[in-house]
Amino acid sequence: FAPSISSFIFLFPIFLFFNFIPMASVEVESAPVAAVETTTPAEVEATPAPEVTKVEEPAPVVEKEVEVESAPAPVEEEAAPVAEEAAALVAEEPAAAEPTAAVAAAVEPVAAPVEEPAAAEEPAAAEEPVAAAPVEEAAAPKAEPEEAPVSEPEAEKAEEASPVSEEPEKVEEIIQWLMNDGFFFIIEVWLCLFSFLVEYFIYYYYYYILI
C-alpha cells in the first residue's frame, strides 16, 4: 500500500482528534496560576489594622474625675456626726455658754476643708478640655496620610503582575503543543506533502527491479 491522498483522507480525522484533546489540559493547568495571584492583595489590606488602635488614649483622664468627686464624700459624712454631738451637748448643758462656743469653734474648721476639694475640682475641670483637645487634633492628621498611599501600590502591583502572568501561560501552551500535537502534526505534514514523492520512488524502485 503506497501512501497517497487516500492516506491523508484516512489520517486527517485522527490528527484532528489528537489536536483537540490536549487543549482541555492546558486550561486546567493554567487555572491554579490565576488563583494564586488573587491571594496577594489580601496581605496588603491587613496592614493598616493595628495602627488605628493608637487613638484610644483619653481613658485615663476620665478616671481622674472620678477620684476627685469621690474625695469630698467622706468629709460630709464626718461633718454630720460632729453636728449631732454638738446638738446633744447643747441640750444637756443649756446654761454653760463657753462649751457651746468651743463646740461651734470645733464645727467651723470642719466646714472649711469641705470647700477645698471644690476649688481643686475647678482647675481640674478647666484642664480637661485643654488635654482632650490636642488628642483629637493629633488623631485627625494620622488618619489622612495612612489611607492615601495604600491604594497606590495595589494598582501598581496589579499592572505589573498582569503582563508577567501572560508570558508563562503562552510558553506552557507552546511546550504542551510540541509534546502532544507537534509529533502528529509533523507526521501529517510529511505524509500529505511528500506522499506523492514516496509514491514515485516506489514505482521507480519496482520498475528498476523488473528491468
UniProtKB/Swiss-Prot annotation:
<feature type="repeat" description="6">
    <location>
        <begin position="115"/>
        <end position="120"/>
    </location>
</feature>
<feature type="repeat" description="3; approximate">
    <location>
        <begin position="84"/>
        <end position="88"/>
    </location>
</feature>
<feature type="repeat" description="2; approximate">
    <location>
        <begin position="76"/>
        <end position="81"/>
    </location>
</feature>
<feature type="repeat" description="7">
    <location>
        <begin position="121"/>
        <end position="126"/>
    </location>
</feature>
<feature type="repeat" description="8; approximate">
    <location>
        <begin position="127"/>
        <end position="133"/>
    </location>
</feature>
<feature type="repeat" description="5; approximate">
    <location>
        <begin position="107"/>
        <end position="112"/>
    </location>
</feature>
<feature type="repeat" description="4">
    <location>
        <begin position="92"/>
        <end position="97"/>
    </location>
</feature>
<feature type="repeat" description="9; approximate">
    <location>
        <begin position="136"/>
        <end position="140"/>
    </location>
</feature>
<feature type="repeat" description="1; approximate">
    <location>
        <begin position="56"/>
        <end position="61"/>
    </location>
</feature>
<protein>
    <recommendedName>
        <fullName>Induced stolen tip protein TUB8</fullName>
    </recommendedName>
</protein>
<feature type="compositionally biased region" description="Low complexity">
    <location>
        <begin position="114"/>
        <end position="152"/>
    </location>
</feature>
<feature type="region of interest" description="Disordered">
    <location>
        <begin position="114"/>
        <end position="167"/>
    </location>
</feature>
<feature type="region of interest" description="9 X 6-7 AA repeats of E-E-P-A-A-A">
    <location>
        <begin position="56"/>
        <end position="141"/>
    </location>
</feature>
<keyword id="KW-0677">Repeat</keyword>
